[in-house]
Curated annotation (Swiss-Prot):
Protein name per UniProt: Putative methyltransferase YfdM
EC number(s) from the headed UniProt entry: 2.1.1.-
Enzyme class: transferase
Anything else known: Encoded by the CPS-53 (KpLE1) prophage. May be missing up to 130 C-terminal residues compared to orthologs.
Bridged cysteine pairs (disulfide): none
Organism: Escherichia coli (strain K12)
């Protein structure tokens, strides 16, 4: 694993059950909100913060990829669109 956050995600996924408070930062953006924002600011073609299973775009960075460690400009130019970001946050 590349960092403690990614390791914690794997451990959480491997548990047979969990409490909602344990996955507070893993909720995905609701589809209606995503499509509304996409209509105003898109087209979104790159999801910056996903666990791989909750991606809103076909192209994405996972927590292990760490979108903040990359320059997205070339990838966005290739994909011809904008980046969508709803980062995980603890609650």
């Amino acid at each position: 694993m590349s960092n403690k956050y990614c390791q914690a995600l794997v451990e959480l996924r491997n548990k047979p059950a969990h409490e909602l408070k344990e996955v507070g930062d893993q909720w995905r953006t609701p589809d209606n909100i995503f499509w509304g924002i996409n209509t105003l600011f898109g087209p979104f073609v790159l999801d910056l913060f996903t666990d791989g299973d909750n991606a809103k775009c076909a192209a994405y960075y996972t927590a292990e990829d760490n979108a903040l460690a990359h320059d997205w400009s070339e990838r966005l130019a290739e994909l011809k669109g904008a980046a969508f970001g709803n980062p995980p946050y603890p609650w």
